[in-house]
Amino acid sequence: MAFTSAVITFPGSNCDRDMAVAIEQVCGGTVHRVWHGDADLPEGLDFIALPGGFSYGDYLRSGAMAARSPVMQAVVRAAERGVTVLGVCNGFQVLTEAGLLPGALMRNAGIRFVCRDVKLTVENNQSLFTAGYDAGQQITIPVAHHDGNYFADDATLDRIEGEGRVAFRYAEEVNGSARNIAGVLNDRGNVLGMMPHPERMIEAAHGGSDGRALFESVVRGLVEA
């Protein structure tokens, strides 16, 4: 079975090529490049990725306008059918604005853009995205964001913690995120949003390969299982 994926590009996306290259190199198969104005997605998709960037210039709120793009209606329908969806950085913001993930991403504490490698702890390795890691494993993945401060009310935080839906946690305070949450799963486990950029860490020659296992986990879970 060939792996078929799509990378969504919004006006202002700037990590869409990086995401497509990572998927091509690690997962193989066919990677479709899909424009925000497309009302439909290609048939037979296994995986959809929403990349980082500054969609629509982050006007109104980060991800708010992109979440109302024609293509996002198709992405929401696909996610509800069980298609695997990954949102990274701005993609995470879009997923929360579209209602596919709980919480919101706010301006970083300190009102500063954060761009550096950070340590993450793998909180849940039982998901499709994280099965290639060990529970409690520390990995190094870069961040680059101004609005990555994850917020949810206490009841929501308690619920997602109790349901094992925190996929990744910052090993130390990075941007003010509630409980240092860096990545969150939906209740079905087929949608992951995370602020750090795993697609930038797939080759040791480029500074590290800790992000590679995420893509390997996805293709193994969807194709090789």
UniProtKB/Swiss-Prot annotation:
Q: What is its EC number?
A: 6.3.5.3, 3.5.1.2
Asked whether the keyword Iron is assigned, the reply is no
Catalysed reaction equations from the record: N(2)-formyl-N(1)-(5-phospho-beta-D-ribosyl)glycinamide + L-glutamine + ATP + H2O = 2-formamido-N(1)-(5-O-phospho-beta-D-ribosyl)acetamidine + L-glutamate + ADP + phosphate + H(+); L-glutamine + H2O = L-glutamate + NH4(+)
Q: In which pathway does it act?
A: Purine metabolism; IMP biosynthesis via de novo pathway; 5-amino-1-(5-phospho-D-ribosyl)imidazole from N(2)-formyl-N(1)-(5-phospho-D-ribosyl)glycinamide: step 1/2
**Catalytic machinery residues:** 89 (nucleophile), 197, 199
Q: Name one GO biological process term.
A: 'de novo' IMP biosynthetic process
Where is the protein situated, by its record's location annotation? Cytoplasm
One GO MF term attached to the UniProt entry? ATP binding
Glutamine amidotransferase type-1 domain location: 5-225
Q: Which GO terms describe its cellular component?
A: cytoplasm
User: Which UniProt key words apply to this protein?
Assistant: ATP-binding, Cytoplasm, Glutamine amidotransferase, Hydrolase, Ligase, Nucleotide-binding, Purine biosynthesis
- Name the CDD domains for this protein: GATase1_FGAR_AT
Coiled coil ranges (UniProt) are none
Where is this protein chiefly located?
A: cytoplasm
What is this protein for, i.e. what is its function? Part of the phosphoribosylformylglycinamidine synthase complex involved in the purines biosynthetic pathway. Catalyzes the ATP-dependent conversion of formylglycinamide ribonucleotide (FGAR) and glutamine to yield formylglycinamidine ribonucleotide (FGAM) and glutamate. The FGAM synthase complex is composed of three subunits. PurQ produces an ammonia molecule by converting glutamine to glutamate. PurL transfers the ammonia molecule to FGAR to form FGAM in an ATP-dependent manner.
Q: How does it assemble?
A: Part of the FGAM synthase complex composed of 1 PurL, 1 PurQ and 2 PurS subunits.
Question: Do you know which NCBIfam families this protein is assigned to?
Answer: FGAM_synth_I (TIGR01737), PRK03619.1 (NF002957)
HAMAP family linked to this entry = PurQ
Q: What is this protein called?
A: Phosphoribosylformylglycinamidine synthase subunit PurQ
